[in-house]
Curated annotation (Swiss-Prot):
Catalysed conversion reaction: tRNA(Asp) + L-aspartate + ATP = L-aspartyl-tRNA(Asp) + AMP + diphosphate
Binding residues annotated for ATP, in chain numbering: R266, D267, E268, E535, G584, L585, D586, R587
Record key words, sorted: Acetylation, Aminoacyl-tRNA synthetase, ATP-binding, Disease variant, Ligase, Membrane, Mitochondrion, Nucleotide-binding, Phosphoprotein, Protein biosynthesis, Transit peptide
Entry's family note: Belongs to the class-II aminoacyl-tRNA synthetase family. Type 1 subfamily.
Lineage: Eukaryota, Metazoa, Chordata, Craniata, Vertebrata
Protein name (record): Aspartate--tRNA ligase, mitochondrial
Enzyme class: ligase
Organism: Homo sapiens (Human)
Domain of life: Eukaryota
Coiled-coil ranges from the UniProt annotation: none
């Protein structure tokens, strides 16, 4: 059995980085994290009946009388058991003499995962029986007294990392799942990172931690919101999708620097890795520009970063929205690996290849390509067919695969239509080697880039399933993305505009004139923070001029300004220039811990359908309880219910 150690390391710092996030961690890691915040190690046994925790005992405690409380993790042949608490594991010797028969009975008959209290003496393990993999592996407890605090019924699953459980079963019995090493580590690391963020913001930089209301009013645009009925007929509160308006109002109120660990809510339906309620590190500052916000966040992450990971290197690189789309085909690129999109339009200006010629003859037409290193070695024919079918089905685009053989000769259906000079120029531009595969497409710029961006990730997945490591799991690659468009055409009516992010985002200073002539071309002062292909934060400089805010809302977005009259009125009373950002805490901790889902870093998450499987929530409410809210439930027909799911 492997006895992990994590709590003391979390406090005291690691002697070596943990390279595999999937390895069990216990005991010393938690201690290192607290120690890294320059605080003394907390006293875990104050105010309680135990004298020590299971994971803290060492050879320095030999001869001491101790009282321990915990769960029975494992028992062997009624001679010893392993006792577990949040701090770690310790071996307990079951007494065999008749004078201790009552103690033996308790410890031998209590089911695994029962809660017991034992008192005894710390002694050395017999020579040759030490366990170097276990932090307490040099000692054991010679028990004198024992008490069964609570017996455990038959478990729905074993609480061991190597025992596979379905996620539904884990969520149904979440209180048992929380006992696992990995969940303990995830939640304690989350707690310590938040503590260090508070320390950095409030103690070092003068931010004020302020709670904003949870009951608010419906906001125009943005994600769908949860409604909360009131006792006034036909009137509802709304759960805020972010404290956006409140934090701007705090700046108007002169608070200058605001911070909150904010609970937010979005009614987005069934999303595989989203939660209807989530947590963000919410920040707003007065008299700040984009550079100031970025520097603050870089320092915040550097200060709060766990010691068992490689340190955060600042400043983070920055790319514009146009650059990341052209290079990676997405606004949240994973920059841990290459396979960048290359524009090869100039090579084919005079081509005889039909679909390339057709694409280049149209406005914004382009020819793009990505190079899959050693793709000929790892990609199978069915993989290439799958890629081509995906391009046709989802993008209505054609993909042309080119295989490079020995001497980088081309193996492609169009090889005979490509001149030698074109072939050599492509090899130079794409920096290809033998056994590489080039995926080439042609079409409108944004569409071609988006397709290749999807295929870049798909091919990375394929290569990694075949043993090629492209994305180092220990590497954290941050990127700022800036200069987003301020508006996007509405999907349902492309002639109308909607905010690319939210309607309070200030336009780029160089593009303010475009609001009155060509608003579709206006850039915003919005910025996203991307980590390993995931957006972990987003913010902007806000509009602090009431007249400009009214113009954008009423004239460009066709929104009812009465719904935001409180904010517009506040901007009229001397609002300072201000800006802010929100970091998605759940997503950030998920990436830091290497967890497969954000549900693994939340104590009591919802399922992907938004259900709490432990308490069977949401639940129905009897009509008499709805009556004070003037609400009556009208159940949908079967066809409507099916569409809802």
């Amino acid at each position: 059995m492997y006895f992990p150690s994590w709590l003391s390391q979390l406090y005291r710092g690691l002697s070596r980085p943990i390279r595999r996030t999937t390895q069990p961690i216990w005991g010393s890691l938690y201690r290192s994290l607290l120690q890294s915040s320059q605080r003394r190690i907390p006293e875990f046994s104050s105010f309680v009946v135990r004298t020590n925790t299971c994971g803290e005992l060492r050879s320095s405690h030999l001869g001491q009388e101790v009282t321990l409380c915990g769960w029975i993790q494992y028992r062997r042949q009624n001679t010893f058991l392993v006792l577990r608490d949040f701090d770690g594991l310790v071996q307990v010797i079951i007494p065999q003499d008749e004078s201790a028969a009552s103690v033996k009975k308790i410890l031998c008959e209590a089911p695994v995962e029962s809660v017991v209290q034992v008192s005894g003496t710390v002694i050395s393990r017999p020579a040759g029986q030490e366990n170097p993999k276990m932090p307490t592996g040099e000692i054991e407890i010679k028990v004198k007294t024992a008490e069964l605090l609570n017996a455990c019924k038959k478990l729905p699953f074993e609480i061991k990392n190597f025992v596979k459980k379905t996620e539904a079963l884990r969520l149904q019995y979440r209180y048992l799942d929380l006992r696992s090493f990995q969940m303990q580590y995830n939640l304690r690391l989350r707690s310590q990172m938040v503590m260090k963020m508070r320390e950095y913001l409030c103690n070092l930089h003068g931010f004020v931690d302020i709670e904003t209301p949870t009951l608010f009013k419906r906001t125009p645009g943005g994600a769908k919101e949860f409604l909360v009925p009131s006792r006034e007929p036909g009137k509802f509160y709304s759960l805020p999708q972010s404290p956006q308006q409140f934090k701007q109002l705090l700046m108007v109120g002169g608070l200058d620097r605001y911070f909150q660990v904010a609970r937010c809510y979005r009614d987005e339906g069934s999303r595989p890795d989203r939660q209807p309620e989530f947590t963000q590190i919410d920040i707003e500052m007065s008299f700040v520009d984009q550079t100031g916000i970025q520097s603050l966040i870089e320092g915040l992450l550097q200060y709060s970063w766990p010691n068992d990971k490689d340190p955060v290197v600042v400043p983070f690189p920055t790319m514009t929205f146009a650059e990341v789309l052209a290079t990676y085909g997405t606004d949240k690129p994973d920059t841990r690996f290459g396979m960048k999109i290359i524009d090869i339009s100039d090579v084919f200006r005079n081509t005889e290849i039909g679909f390339l010629q057709d694409a280049l003859s149209k406005p914004h037409g382009t020819v793009k390509a990505i190079c899959i290193p050693e793709g000929a070695k790892y990609l199978k024919r069915k993989d290439i067919e799958s890629i081509r079918n995906f391009a046709a089905d989802h993008f209505n685009q054609e993909i042309l695969p080119v295989f490079l053989n020995a001497n980088r000769n081309w193996n492609s259906p169009v090889a005979n239509f490509i001149m030698e000079s074109q072939r050599l120029e492509l090899i130079r531009l794409m920096e290809t080697q033998e056994e590489d595969v080039v995926l080439l497409t042609a079409g409108e710029h944004n569409k071609a880039c988006s397709l290749l961006g999807k295929l870049r990730l798909e091919c990375a997945d394929l290569l990694e399933t075949r043993g090629v490591v492209l994305r180092d799991p220990t590497l954290f690659s941050f990127l700022w993305v800036v200069d987003f468009p301020l508006f996007l055409p509405k999907e349902e009516n492309p002639r109308e505009l909607e905010s690319a992010h939210h309607p309070f985002t200030a336009p780029h200073p160089s593009d303010i004139h475009l609001l009155y002539t060509e608003p579709k071309k206006a850039r915003s002062q919005h910025y996203d923070l991307v980590l390993n292909g995931n957006e972990i934060g987003g913010g902007s400089i806000r509009i602090h001029n009431a007249e400009l805010q009214r113009y954008i809302l009423a004239t460009l977005l066709k929104e009812d300004v009465k719904m935001l009259s409180h904010l517009l009125q506040a901007l009229d009373y001397g609002a300072p220039p201000h800006g802010g950002i929100a970091l998605g805490l759940d997503r950030l901790i998920c990436l830091v811990t290497g967890s497969p889902s954000i549900r693994d870093v939340i104590a009591f998450p919802k399922s992907f359908r938004g259900h709490d499987l432990m308490s069977n929530t949401p639940d129905s409410v009897p009509p008499e309880e709805l009556k004070p809210y003037h609400i009556r439930v009208s159940k949908p027909t079967d066809s409507k219910a099916e569409r809802a799911h």
